[in-house]
Curated annotation (Swiss-Prot):
CDD domains: Glyco_transf_25 (cd06532). This is Lacto-N-neotetraose biosynthesis glycosyltransferase LgtE. Pfam families: Glyco_transf_25. Coiled coil: none annotated. It comes from Neisseria meningitidis serogroup B (strain ATCC BAA-335 / MC58). One of its GO terms (molecular function) is glycosyltransferase activity. Its EC number is 2.-.-.-. GO terms for biological process: lipopolysaccharide biosynthetic process. Adds the first galactose to the lacto-N-tetraose chain in lipooligosaccharide (LOS). Belongs to the glycosyltransferase 25 family.
Amino acid sequence: MQNHVISLASAAERRAHIAATFGVRGIPFQFFDALMPSEELNRMMAELVPGLAKQHLLSEVEKACFMSHAVLWKQALDEGLPYVAVFEDDVLLGKDAEKFLAEDTWLEERFDKDSAFIVRLETMFAKVIVRPDKVLNYENRSFPLLESEHWGTAGYIISREAMRFFLERFAVLPAEWIKAVDWMMFTYFFDKEGMPVYQVNPALCTQELHYAKFLSKNSMLGSDLEKDREQERRHRRSLKVMFDLKRALGKFGREKKKRMERQRQAELEKAYGRRVISFK
């Protein structure tokens, strides 16, 4: 398994955390230098996600986060990788993580590497809808289908066809359709045409900040993105008014899709309920 950890080159404390977390378990990994607001970021947006530069409801840091994932996918495609595991540098790993991340036989035995799929390794401790699937358990963890939103991109495995799917669509999406990268991957924001997202349960990883919040403790690492989002909230609310008229042009079709999705989720929730995906 190729494990890539997105991290700022200057983030010494976080990189030490990752080296210790992965190293003690013998999990191979490599850092992928996260993008920062810069001319390089602007060039990569123009090449891969041109609408993102015009999306003023996202901060520059959120755009850099989005593009760090997109550029990593493009690199994986260029290298011909069938799939890649992606992590962020504040991730915590659960029990026996090395059995999932230091080898990939389990993955190829359960998933068609030539198809589009995501295996979500992370939990955000939100109540979500998951539907049982026929994928066999591995090391006391199951792989139900994720049927509701579940934020976060701290840990996931994405196949080549899924990377290609997102990059092809990101390249043509208008600005008003673009959201934060976790919204694009793990909600019904746009039709993923049946591409499955499997939620590992119990989760194999979580963000240190959200685990600390879940335990009502103080975070040791914090979240640069969360800080940036907090600073941007007021700015977003004012900008939102400017976009309401433009968004109204395509509103009715999207609203119909949302209503259908809400109805589908209501039926699934009635059948399966909502649950917090645990971490261990």
